[in-house]
């Protein structure tokens, strides 16, 4: 794997590359992501022909809030590559559907969960949440309870939306276990 990692670093001219746990990690940019994916797929020494997944991560405290990770697998060499792409909130990464057909659903999931829009995607719409859903549930600032309750109304015979109604206020719980009482008391006396 060391040879493959060095070869990839030499050819892609990535600023940073790391490896561990049988996975090579490359940091790409918006301008180079398509070229890097094409190289990794088509180069005879790489042959990362399978896009396993594209997933997002939300880092609200970072200047570049989002990170996209493209998970590639070379079945021939039994090696994985993760290509990480850091994005500002308003960045639109290019769709890679023309490079990997499987990217279509992965990009739709990232859009649905994080609100990241992919330029030139052939069918960018929600895939996991309802079409009327407000917001993107994997964002760290999305409320835990959501904005609306969705339920099936038997009488109306349709799905209805209601504002969230939580009859009980949020409470903080004491994390000490009552079963630790005697042990905790004995330890504090020492």
UniProtKB/Swiss-Prot annotation:
User: What is the annotated localization of this protein?
Assistant: Cell membrane
Q: Which Gene3D superfamilies does this UniProt record tie to the protein?
A: NADH:ubiquinone oxidoreductase, 30kDa subunit
**What keywords sit in the KW lines?**
Cell membrane, Membrane, NAD, Quinone, Translocase, Transport, Ubiquinone
Source taxon at top rank: Bacteria
Coiled-coil portions: none
EC numbers listed for it are: 7.1.1.-
**Cellular component aspect of the GO annotation:** plasma membrane
What SUPFAM superfamilies does this protein map onto? Nqo5-like
Topology relative to the lipid bilayer, per the entry, is: Peripheral membrane protein
Query: Where mainly located?
Result: membrane
Q: Name one GO molecular function term.
A: NADH dehydrogenase (ubiquinone) activity
List the catalysed reactions.
a quinone + NADH + 5 H(+)(in) = a quinol + NAD(+) + 4 H(+)(out)
PANTHER family for this protein: NADH DEHYDROGENASE [UBIQUINONE] IRON-SULFUR PROTEIN 3, MITOCHONDRIAL, NADH DEHYDROGENASE UBIQUINONE IRON-SULFUR PROTEIN 3
What is the similarity comment for this entry? Belongs to the complex I 30 kDa subunit family.
The record describes the protein's role as: NDH-1 shuttles electrons from NADH, via FMN and iron-sulfur (Fe-S) centers, to quinones in the respiratory chain. The immediate electron acceptor for the enzyme in this species is believed to be ubiquinone. Couples the redox reaction to proton translocation (for every two electrons transferred, four hydrogen ions are translocated across the cytoplasmic membrane), and thus conserves the redox energy in a proton gradient.
Listed under subunit, the entry gives: NDH-1 is composed of 14 different subunits. Subunits NuoB, C, D, E, F, and G constitute the peripheral sector of the complex.
Protein name as annotated: NADH-quinone oxidoreductase subunit C
**Protein species of origin:** Wolbachia sp. subsp. Brugia malayi (strain TRS)
- The gene it comes from is nuoC
